[in-house]
Amino acid sequence: MKWSKLIRGINVVAFSCMALAVLLPEIVEARLRVVATTTIIADTVQQIGHDKVTVRSLMGSNPHHYKIRTEDIRHLSQAHLVIYNGLSIENGLRRVLSQLPKDVYIVDVSDCLPKKNLRSSHQFDDHHSHPENSCGYHYDPHFWLNVNHWMVVVRQIEKSLKVIDSNQAHFYHMSSNKYLGQLNELDQYIRSQSEKIPTNLRFLVTSHNALGYFGQAYGFETDGLMGTEGEETSIANLRRLSYKIMDQKLTTIFWDNTTSRKSMQALQESILAKGHKVSLAGPILVGGVLDSRQTLQNCDKHNHSTYDGMMRHNVDTILVHLTPSRDDGN
């Protein structure tokens, strides 16, 4: 009798598994196929769409080094929705995007931001040269580093999902509202952490000069070894930055996850050789969220595979290294 019940139970489980195996492809197929160029856009789509979407990110955590692959073109062509940054990051993709099938809905999220809110790349690195974007302007593409700008983008992504999937409009709206509440808390967190740093110490020197929007929003002056487009630096710029760091009496510089740490080590060594003590800290996450399989040394409590966690990690890293210790007598 016991054996009979056991066998019946096994059969039920087996049948259930077979049914699930048959239904699963249909469930996955029913989801919106969304391709996002950056990991930050992909994370935001996932936060709004949840199980209604299947999201693929193309560029990884360092979009400046991205090179398009054949499989990327296939995913783009098969997508219901393609969302991209729009400001120079995807220069290598523009031709491909223009040739996608007409039934692929394509969204440039930078279009939702007033041009007056976009930073000219020259405002932060006049000493670098820049390739022009398709409009002939030189906009800094790292607007996600100002949380208030990214909250505008959240609404744009919500609208885009509703255009493609109007039956789930209420779901996307409620998810968007919830996520915006989380981002409002994030913005307040960054402000409160930044205010703990003395005003005269709020100077961020990074390997890639990507923190212009962050600095404007949260009260920091910024500079970098490489420009906003991630182009290589020059000996002249390394010398300029060395003397600026010494003149400002800065004691910490930062490396970020889009460039090799070696470039900032070279800057640090140049400054140390001149008799000025400066430490190297990081990484600051500027290019995108990390893959869930990636880890950071001295990992903090934040989830670096989300936009929220990335931004919290950044401000906490800055706070730790720019706040005077008690040993300094401050």
Where are each of the predicted segments found?
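Bacterial N-terminal signal peptides
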Residues: 10-23
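Extracytoplasmic metal-acquisition and chelation regions
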Residues: 24-330
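Residues marking helix boundaries in flexible regions
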Residues: 8-11, 28
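N-terminal secretory signal peptides that target proteins for export/translocation
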Residues: 1-6
